[in-house]
């Protein structure tokens, strides 16, 4: 299983879509607070449909609580990847492993410098885009990376028809 980490997500439908994605892929979802919405927001529920009960979701009070609660230190910190337009390697250049953490920033501002500055360059990855593009929608970005990582892991746990 892999882990999706949303750092202070702001837009309920994006998070709802990602909940549904995690429920359908078996990925763990981590939400780092504060959230830009309440947990009972109808837009969150509508986007996630009835998948909330099938997704494995953990909420963390802040970034440091996330690191501590998940034991993301030392060697395991090397398996935390930050998706950022400031990254160099493409998301598809990473050799993903079970247990990896894929962290995405808030929709309007991306990951803060105090997170990115403490990560080595090879852990700051990006999704290729055209030169004049600013960013992609959060839920679309998560889906792109999730399916690349899952593909590399042989779609572990998926029902595949031969």
Curated annotation (Swiss-Prot):
Enzyme nomenclature, EC number: 2.1.1.207
Cell location: Cytoplasm
Residues the record lists as binding S-adenosyl-L-methionine: 83, 105, 127, 135
GO BP term, example: wobble position uridine ribose methylation
UniProt keywords, alphabetically: Cytoplasm, Methyltransferase, S-adenosyl-L-methionine, Transferase, tRNA processing
GO cellular component, one term: cytoplasm
UniProt main location, coarse: cytoplasm
InterPro entries tied to this protein: Alpha/beta_knot_MTases, SpoU_MeTrfase, TrmL, tRNA_m1G_MTases_N
Catalytic activity reported: cytidine(34) in tRNA + S-adenosyl-L-methionine = 2'-O-methylcytidine(34) in tRNA + S-adenosyl-L-homocysteine + H(+); 5-carboxymethylaminomethyluridine(34) in tRNA(Leu) + S-adenosyl-L-methionine = 5-carboxymethylaminomethyl-2'-O-methyluridine(34) in tRNA(Leu) + S-adenosyl-L-homocysteine + H(+)
Broad class of enzyme this protein falls into: transferase
HAMAP family per record: tRNA_methyltr_TrmL
PANTHER family tied to this protein: TRNA (CYTIDINE(34)-2'-O)-METHYLTRANSFERASE
Oligomeric and partner information: Homodimer.
Described purpose of this protein according to its UniProt entry: Methylates the ribose at the nucleotide 34 wobble position in the two leucyl isoacceptors tRNA(Leu)(CmAA) and tRNA(Leu)(cmnm5UmAA). Catalyzes the methyl transfer from S-adenosyl-L-methionine to the 2'-OH of the wobble nucleotide.
Family under the similarity heading: Belongs to the class IV-like SAM-binding methyltransferase superfamily. RNA methyltransferase TrmH family. TrmL subfamily.
Listed name of the protein: tRNA (cytidine(34)-2'-O)-methyltransferase
Organism expressing this protein natively: Photorhabdus asymbiotica subsp. asymbiotica (strain ATCC 43949 / 3105-77)
Gene designation per UniProt: trmL
């Amino acid at each position: 299983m892999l882990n999706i980490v949303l750092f202070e997500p702001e837009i309920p439908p994006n998070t709802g879509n990602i909940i549904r994605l995690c429920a359908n892929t078996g990925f763990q979802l981590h939400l780092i607070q504060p959230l830009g919405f309440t947990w009972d927001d109808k837009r969150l529920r509508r986007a996630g449909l009835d998948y909330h009960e099938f997704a494995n979701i953990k909420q963390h009070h802040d970034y440091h609580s996330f690191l501590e609660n998940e034991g993301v230190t030392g060697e395991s910190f090397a398996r935390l990847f930050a998706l950022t337009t400031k990254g160099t390697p493409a998301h598809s250049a990473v050799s993903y492993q079970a247990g990896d953490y894929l962290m995405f920033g808030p929709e309007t501002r991306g990951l803060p410098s105090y997170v990115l500055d403490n990560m080595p360059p090879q852990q700051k990855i990006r999704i290729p885009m055209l030169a004049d593009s600013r960013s992609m929608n959060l839920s679309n970005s998560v889906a792109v990376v999730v399916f690349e990582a899952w593909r590399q892991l042989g779609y572990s746990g998926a029902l595949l028809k031969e």
